[in-house]
Swiss-Prot record:
S5 DRBM domain segment(s): 144-208
Keywords: Mitochondrion, Ribonucleoprotein, Ribosomal protein, Transit peptide
Species assigned in the record: Saccharomyces cerevisiae (strain ATCC 204508 / S288c)
Chain's role: Component of the mitochondrial ribosome (mitoribosome), a dedicated translation machinery responsible for the synthesis of mitochondrial genome-encoded proteins, including at least some of the essential transmembrane subunits of the mitochondrial respiratory chain. The mitoribosomes are attached to the mitochondrial inner membrane and translation products are cotranslationally integrated into the membrane.
More about this protein: Present with 6680 molecules/cell in log phase SD medium.
Protein name according to UniProt: Small ribosomal subunit protein uS5m
Similarity comment: family membership: Belongs to the universal ribosomal protein uS5 family.
């Protein structure tokens, strides 16, 4: 038994270089380190974990310095006390190991996609529309809100048979008077149809006049194809008591108080298009009324209760 224990201790002592350990540990700890190595079973196999992609290629053998995961050799170590029992100040900017050459920040054997990582679809829309229209990409990604209104599967009858496709109608807005409606189609999947509709909606952004930044100017009776819309302005705190499609459009446009009824056809697509057209074309602002009458109109509420 004594011979076996002696042989294992000799084998573990030969595994480490005492000169290397003495650089990082005092002599009082070297003996305990050597004794701790004897408790490791002989049949233990040290392998790299396969489940972790960004893992060092070793487990507990910290006597060797890895070229990527560790610091460069010769750097100061703070765990060993000096003769004066004072610790030196560790400056991270000076001791930090620089990145490997050629701008590669990943360990060997790991790669990323060609685009450098995953991008959101809204970022792709913003980048493309910035080149096409000059709209700020941050405005598209951060301030614009997108809501799908209609998503359905369409089947077209042709000479070759029935061809299925996907249709999407979405609305975008910044909740501050800007709103746009877009349509998209795709034969592959619904997500691509929504992507195209989002692209089209941002290009169709329009400004909606709002009274006190919360409701519409007066009442609107508007007809769009088979849809009849009756929209009424409301007092503060009234809320949105309208059709579910008109509700989503008002949320994106920043309209907070509105009452409305939909008569005749209840087609969601025509309701959405008719609502946008009613907001942009059927409203008459105070300036337009004053210009038509040839008189000066004053908003009494703003005159007496202006801030």
């Amino acid at each position: 038994m004594f011979k076996r224990q002696l042989s294992t201790s000799v084998r573990y002592l030969q595994h480490y270089d005492e000169s290397l350990l003495s650089r990082y540990y005092p002599e009082s700890l070297l003996k305990s380190i050597k004794l701790a190595q004897q408790t490791i079973p002989e049949d233990t196999k040290f392998r790299v974990s396969r489940n972790v992609e960004f893992a060092p290629p070793y487990l507990d053998d910290f006597t060797k310095i890895h070229p990527f995961w560790d610091y460069k050799p010769g750097m100061p170590h703070l765990h060993a006390q000096e003769e004066n029992n004072n610790f030196s100040i560790f400056r991270w900017d000076q001791v930090q190991q620089p990145l490997p050459g050629e701008g590669n920040i990943l360990p060997p054997g790991v790669s990323l996609p060609n685009d450098g990582g995953r991008k959101s679809k809204s970022a792709d829309v913003a980048a493309g529309l910035h080149k096409q229209t000059g709209v700020d990409p941050d405005y598209i990604t951060r301030k614009l809100t997108m809501k799908p209104l209609v998503m359905k599967r369409v089947s077209n009858q042709t000479g070759k048979g029935k061809i299925a496709s996907f249709y999407a109608l979405v609305v975008v807005g910044d909740k501050n008077g800007m709103v746009g409606l877009g349509e998209g189609k795709s034969r592959e999947e619904m997500s691509k149809a929504i992507f195209k509709a989002h692209w089209d909606a941002v290009r169709n952004l329009k400004e909606i006049p709002r009274y006190e930044n919360r409701t519409i100017y007066g009442d609107i009776d508007f007809r769009y194809h088979g849809v009849k819309l009756h929209l009424r302005s409301a007092k503060p705190g009234f809320g949105l008591r309208v059709n579910h499609v008109i509700f989503e459009i008002c949320e994106c446009a920043g309209i907070k108080d509105l009452s409305g009824k939909v008569y005749k056809s209840r087609n969601d697509m025509n309701i959405a298009k008719g609502t946008i057209e009613a907001f942009t074309k059927a409203q008459k602002t105070l300036d337009e009324v004053a210009l038509g009458r040839g008189k000066k109109l004053v908003d009494v509420r703003k005159v007496y209760y202006s801030s």
